Amino acid sequence: MLRTCTVTIAAMTLGAALVLGTEGRAGEPIQVGGKMTCKTPEQHSIPVEGDPGHVLVVQIETCVGSASGESGRFDGAQQRWFEVDDLVKGSGMIHGYELAKYKDGSTGITSYAGAQVTTMINGKPEWTALGTFEQTKGTGSMANIQVRGTWTAKPTSETEFVMDWVGTMTEGTK
């Protein structure tokens, strides 16, 4: 009887610890999404010698996010992107990092990668891009969450573009 009582008490103690300690456990993924309006204030193109039409591009982009509903925490985010593109005749791979500053003072660093495709439309090159992203670090309310998903982008002018993004946000995963 003593052994059964000890095992029961131990199991109850462990069960209580698990219930009381759920703060660090991952929550259910929430669908999130929004739009970013972006500008490219700085861009440097380096031609790849001996390979006509091949350039490496290093650029900084600034964006303002808009979102609502479950995605409301992303609304008004101020972002700076640091990007490297490897393009042949305007098409190729892109990769970068984005630093977001949110209204509540939190920050997030996100890694992204994708592909850009450039086609001629009415005699002018026009690009579209798509890819994936994942938040790698965060502070404040963004410190203990995971955000990942997909994005698509298209230009609105020579130095501006819009990006739509969708994904999942899971709290308590880091």
Question: What positions do the PLM features span?
Answer:
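Positively charged n-region of N-terminal signal peptides that target proteins for export
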Residues: 1-7
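Bacterial N-terminal signal peptides
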Residues: 8-19
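Beta-strand-enriched cores of mature, soluble protein domains
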Residues: 24-174
